[in-house]
């Protein structure tokens, strides 16, 4: 799907509001600034960029959460730092755990919002089958939003990029068993071990789908921390591992790892949606949606892979990677 350049599109949103926030700009120039407070109470000063600081937003406190892997933490930091730049009092509660834990946290008010994948919400929360998840990002977000509204939650428009689960292996294993698609596992899966996140066992877009829709039975399934999904392959602890299509290792180490084609479409791709309470949106005002939508526009697949690489391969912190994205896009001052 064609998208505008993130920086250009983002600025156009804010330019439309320039007339109504002129006072905010004056106050910002006089020294007002936003803060993003992380879960360990570390404060971060966010300088003014093209995101406009609105002093009225200082009345609103937000806690941004995330699930427990780098991409999620990067997204959580992007939202948190951008909202702090817009004037909100922001804390982070990142690395909460699985989608079930994050959903409970936002429903109970432990956090104000977190990034979720529309396909994950539809299949894991609301009982949709993989084939029932729309391939169109806006349609998937709309369906998820309808379901979330029943819980007092809502979402904003999705990110340009989408991510999906995938079955990966080493090139050595793929060549040994002539594996190109997931269906190719049919005759050999009983000889192979599979590693995945703890929640993978019950998810239809993970082990449950591989068993039910592909008819596969593995020698073993072992729950593993998401951060170890590649090391178990490299160390020979697993023959197969559940990976993500946005993983930077797939491009950086293509000589080592292979993704098997999901020929039966068990793993629907999911664009990210900002899940939050309706009451939060009401309290925060229009600046919440405008800020979230603005910083999302630049999040293409290539860009998200680059941000993931900064954290997973170059060992930057999610906070550092998020700030680099916001600065390079002109959202906040460098």
Task: Locate the predicted segments by residue.
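C-terminal motif of bacterial Sec signal peptides marking the signal peptidase cleavage site
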Residues: 25-29
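Bacterial lipoprotein signal-peptidase II cleavage site
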Residues: 31-40
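Extracytoplasmic "Venus flytrap"
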Residues: 43-77, 94-98, 199-202
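Short helices/loops that flank or line small-molecule/ion binding pockets
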Residues: 77-82, 100-111, 127, 208-213, ...
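Short helix-initiation/N-cap motifs at beta->coil->alpha
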Residues: 92-104, 198, 219-231
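A ligand-binding cleft/hinge motif common to bilobed small-molecule-binding domains
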Residues: 118-129, 140-144, 232-259
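A conserved helix-loop-strand patch within extracytoplasmic ligand-binding domains
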Residues: 134-194, 278-279, 297-301
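Periplasmic-binding protein-like
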Residues: 152-154, 159-164, 248-295
């Amino acid at each position: 799907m064609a998208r505008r350049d993130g920086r250009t599109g983002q600025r156009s949103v804010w330019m439309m509001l320039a007339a109504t926030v002129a006072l905010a700009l004056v106050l910002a120039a006089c020294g007002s600034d936003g803060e993003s407070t992380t879960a360990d109470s570390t404060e971060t000063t966010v300088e003014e960029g093209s995101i406009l600081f609105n002093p009225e937003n200082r009345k609103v406190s937000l806690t941004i959460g995330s699930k427990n892997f780098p991409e999620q933490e990067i997204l959580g930091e992007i939202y948190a730092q951008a909202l702090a730049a817009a004037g909100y009092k922001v804390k982070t509660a990142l690395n909460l755990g699985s989608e079930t834990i994050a959903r409970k946290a936002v429903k109970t008010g432990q956090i104000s919002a977190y990034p979720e994948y529309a396909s994950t919400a539809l299949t894991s929360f609301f009982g949709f089958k993989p084939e029932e998840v729309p391939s169109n990002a806006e349609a998937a977000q709309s369906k998820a939003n309808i379901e979330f509204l029943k819980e007092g939650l809502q979402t904003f428009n999705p990110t340009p990029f989408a991510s999906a689960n995938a079955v990966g292996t080493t090139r050595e294993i793929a060549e040994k068993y002539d594996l190109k698609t997931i269906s190719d596992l049919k005759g050999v899966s009983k000889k192979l071990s599979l590693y995945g996140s703890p929640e993978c066992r019950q998810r239809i877009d993970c082990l449950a789908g591989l068993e039910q829709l592909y008819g596969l039975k593995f020698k073993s399934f072992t729950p593993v921390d998401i951060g170890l999904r590649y090391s178990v392959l490299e160390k020979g602890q697993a023959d197969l591992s559940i990976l993500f299509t946005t993983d930077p290792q797939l491009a950086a180490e293509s000589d080592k790892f292979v993704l098997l084609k999901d020929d039966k479409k068990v793993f629907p791709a999911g664009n990210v949606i900002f899940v939050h309470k309706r009451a939060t949106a009401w309290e925060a005002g229009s600046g919440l949606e405008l800020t979230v939508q603005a910083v999302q526009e630049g999040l293409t697949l290539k860009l998200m892979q680059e941000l993931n690489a900064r954290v997973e391969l170059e060992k930057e912190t999610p906070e550092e990677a998020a700030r680099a994205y916001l600065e390079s896009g002109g959202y906040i001052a460098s």
